[in-house]
């Protein structure tokens, strides 16, 4: 199948027109592009561990880990390396191909970089792909993580540029995009997506995807999150449940605008029916998080995911071979 050239010049008007297509046509276009770039029966798997929880100085209105909100989440210190590696071993045994480590920081301190790099090397030595989400990074920190063997860096832009000020005031969309660009220039693969259900309009969801699809290079992975109900955060008062078909349309639009990117169903799958997840896979989603816990929210039990994939005739994508990590 011929693969159309990837575009980074999408307009909101084009995306809006695609998003509004009759459902069968939208799904057909998304599935056609999905098949041009991926095995349509293969689902990638990742596992996520909070290596430093709570106490974050950012005031993101959706997040349980912000020090600005009274959510009952207690701040912890950075995990010890062996504790992280034990979790990585369990994740691999459960079928994860990638191990993501998240810390609730605005940005990591230089004093923590040695420990973070040791974690990356240790996880890579287990044969897992490595991913971190630590907040904003300096070019020097990007270089150190790259040298340690970090494969992916997650840094979501969360929502549209127009709606961003409604969810955070301690950082800007420009701050987020600057880190994404630093990571890309540093040779680490970019994982960047957003969150639905925070009170944003349909236009904001479309604009979020256009922002990602018009970056100098499309993100390698695009997580699609549904906001989870969290007591004590500002978003709680304006959050609205996302219509199931609206979610499928956004997944399909992500696949069409960024056909070579992995589209991951991330937070919120505990609220999705099997039928809704199946529609999302049909629309082009081809990755999930496995394991009972994400950062501070729940995730479907491993047996449920295995059962769902089996019933759909889908399989876990084979792990990619990773090159050996050079010693310091």
Curated annotation (Swiss-Prot):
Q: Name one Pfam family in it.
A: BATS
- InterPro entries tied to this protein: Aldolase_TIM, BATS_dom, Biotin_synth/BioAB, Biotin_synthase, Elp3/MiaA/NifB-like_rSAM, rSAM
Instruction: Specify the superkingdom.
Output: Bacteria
Task: Extract the Gene3D superfamilies matched here.
Answer: Aldolase class I (3.20.20.70)
What cofactor(s) does the depicted protein rely on? [4Fe-4S] cluster; [2Fe-2S] cluster
Q: Which controlled-vocabulary keywords does the entry list? A: 2Fe-2S, 4Fe-4S, Biotin biosynthesis, Iron, Iron-sulfur, Metal-binding, S-adenosyl-L-methionine, Transferase
> According to the record, how does the cofactor bind?
Binds 1 [4Fe-4S] cluster. The cluster is coordinated with 3 cysteines and an exchangeable S-adenosyl-L-methionine.
| Pathway assigned in UniProt | Cofactor biosynthesis; biotin biosynthesis; biotin from 7,8-diaminononanoate: step 2/2
Q: Which chain positions lie within coiled-coil regions?
A: none
GO MF term set: 2 iron, 2 sulfur cluster binding; 4 iron, 4 sulfur cluster binding; biotin synthase activity; iron ion binding
Q: Which family would the database say this protein is a member of?
A: Belongs to the radical SAM superfamily. Biotin synthase family.
Assembly information from the UniProt record: Homodimer.
Indicate what this protein is called per its UniProt record. Answer: Biotin synthase
State the organism of origin: Cereibacter sphaeroides (strain ATCC 17029 / ATH 2.4.9) (Rhodobacter sphaeroides)
Q: What is the lineage of its organism?
A: Bacteria, Pseudomonadati, Pseudomonadota, Alphaproteobacteria, Rhodobacterales
What's the encoding gene here? bioB
